Amino acid sequence: MYQPEDDNNSDVTSDDDMTRNRRESSPPHSVHSFSGDRDWDRRGRSRDMEPRDRWSHTRNPRSRMPPRDLSLPVVAKTSFEMDREDDRDSRAYESRSQDAESYQNVVDLAEDRKPHNTIQDNMENYRKLLSLGFLAQDSVPAEKRNTEMLDNLPSAGSQFPDFKHLGTFLVFEELVTFEDVLVDFSPEELSSLSAAQRNLYREVMLENYRNLVSLGHQFSKPDIISRLEEEESYAMETDSRHTVICQGESHDDPLEPHQGNQEKLLTPITMNDPKTLTPERSYGSDEFERSSNLSKQSKDPLGKDPQEGTAPGICTSPQSASQENKHNRCEFCKRTFSTQVALRRHERIHTGKKPYECKQCAEAFYLMPHLNRHQKTHSGRKTSGCNEGRKPSVQCANLCERVRIHSQEDYFECFQCGKAFLQNVHLLQHLKAHEAARVLPPGLSHSKTYLIRYQRKHDYVGERACQCCDCGRVFSRNSYLIQHYRTHTQERPYQCQLCGKCFGRPSYLTQHYQLHSQEKTVECDHC
């Protein structure tokens, strides 16, 4: 408890004494400790708990009370305050100078801040400075920069175990080259690109190349840039020509879409060249040629009817399609062809000219495929034996050489009966019938056998009825007709090997064998 002081001391403590006592008081024990305040509070409570009659000191007026220290104790800075200080430092750094910064200054600043990932931040700063072209102005040698930078970095091996060998990738002695920004596609990838993607690729590549040239880069022009520039110039020329030609186009259909413009830029087509309009016809492709001629006569390349006339400004050839066909028209049959080569090949049929001659037998042909097929007969391949006399006979692929084949006139005629077919395969099947008809059954004439197997009751397509010559009965299949014919001839070609009985059908012979299998064998009692 407080003891009363002497009378010599004044009852009221002066302000100077209170200030001196506060200075001599010990500081707080810890930045987070509030023990000083707790002591003051405890002293105050103990003083209030004393009886007022035992308190001998006179209470000081409120105006003369010593001022208490109401300031908060010292507390460690939080992360939020540290971030605010970093922001102020960064703003001060940005406003400090507008000159170009070197890579070393950026690295030092990054090390002072101690970011979470030093390698990633340094690489990002290097890429930004490299894109602005500032590293070329740095006068410090590259080797010295690498050494200083690696020495200044933290040496904690556990945090950056593999950073030493990455130092050579942080600083380069030269600026960016064209190979760094080159987007290289293989021919297969270029062919798979669409027209819009190809145009975008050309624009990006040329823009990157021109940007590097504008920055003062000195290097030879790559081959891909030369090709892209030629393609760009051709595209611009084609667009300008198309604009000039289509200025006089009629405005009846102003919203008519022009499809395929991008494909035309990549694959130029000259409208005056007839070879580009019609594909080359191979040998024996008259049906394709006829269809292409009909399509050309019905519509021009832009889809308009040539009979309606040509509007001014439409990209057409100087001569119409009908006038062009007049030059390729046959004088004998008035048939038109797309090219002069097809016309000359067709005229050989009328003139009888056969320029392709066999060197072994001196037989001439007017088409090369016919000569090639004929030469296979001399090699001895594709032969088979005759059923009766075992004489070598030519296969069906070579039988057409003995027939007058008019491939250009779209029909194939049999030399034996004069029957014509639209396809060569049907003629070969017909010739097989003639070869099979030579094997005659006993007592049957050649003409009768042919009628039994191949005569049709009706001529129109879809009815395949076979009629018997003896009784007039009609069958839908040849096999039924042959079985019916055996009833007239009493032919029984199927003979049992056990008893020698003959049958006209294989099903009858099968049933007969079943009867033999059901017979029970009789055992001899003696043996």
Curated annotation (Swiss-Prot):
Compositional bias segments (type: Polar residues): 259-275
Species of the source: Homo sapiens (Human)
Protein's recorded name: Zinc finger imprinted 2
Short name of any one Pfam family annotated for the protein: zf-C2H2
UniProt-annotated stretches for the region Disordered: 1-104, 247-322
PROSITE patterns named in the record: KRAB (PS50805), ZINC_FINGER_C2H2_1 (PS00028), ZINC_FINGER_C2H2_2 (PS50157)
Compositionally biased spans, kind Basic and acidic residues: 17-26, 35-56, 80-99, 297-307
GO cellular component: nucleus
